[in-house]
A protein has these predicted regions:
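Gly/Pro/Ser/Thr-rich low-complexity, intrinsically disordered segments predominantly at protein N-termini
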Residues: 1-188
Length: 188
């Protein structure tokens, strides 16, 4: 039986999942996963709260197995932390980093606080002057940290829509399509 989850965890999980889902709906070749077993190695099969990945046919670093599990690291993993904060910020962070996850987002309920690691850049993704965090791996994935933490969905949605309308997001979508076309050409 799974560990019991508090209402606050479910609420934050749903809010963050909605952001990632909207992003993936507007970005062909990207999908959002919710509590999916992810095979990272022989002894590492975590079930992250949320993940955002580039599909393998678009050049992503993970793939779907015949049994419909994800094998290999998703580009972004997100955890909602309450009682698991220490584990999420230390052991899980190290496991995901070593496995090749490129960005790791922890939404800490206590505080509340949004902590976003960019592993390839060896640093954290911090909010700009307006409180907006911008993914380096998924251009246009903009999260208004104060709005998310305060539960102001309309403001967060407006910021994400702005990110999805950005030139960076448009260029990313074109890059994904070119990768897809190139990979498809190799298979035929």
């Amino acid at each position: 039986m799974a560990s019991p989850l508090r209402r606050s965890h479910g609420r934050r999980h749903s809010q963050l999942g909605s952001i990632l889902q909207l992003y993936s709906e507007e970005t062909q070749g990207v999908e959002t996963l919710d509590n999916v077993t992810t095979i990272l190695g022989e002894e590492s099969e975590p079930q992250p709260d949320l993940a955002l990945r580039i599909l393998s046919e678009y050049g992503g670093q993970s793939r779907e197995t015949a049994d419909e599990y994800v094998e290999g690291p998703p580009e972004l993993v997100a955890e909602v932390a309450h009682s698991t904060r220490a584990i999420d910020l230390h052991q899980k962070r190290l496991d995901y980093q070593q496995a090749g996850v490129r960005e790791y987002l922890v939404l800490c309920i206590e505080g509340p606080e949004l902590i976003w690691f960019g592993f390839r850049s060896r640093g954290r993704i911090v909010p700009d002057g307006d409180g907006v965090c911008r993914s380096r791996v998924f251009p246009g994935l903009w999260i208004d940290a104060p709005a998310l933490l305060a539960g102001i969905g309309a403001r967060q949605s407006a910021v994400l829509r702005k990110g999805l309308s950005s030139p960076e997001h448009s260029a990313f979508v074109r890059r994904l399509q070119r990768r897809h076309d190139k990979l498809r050409g190799k298979r035929t």
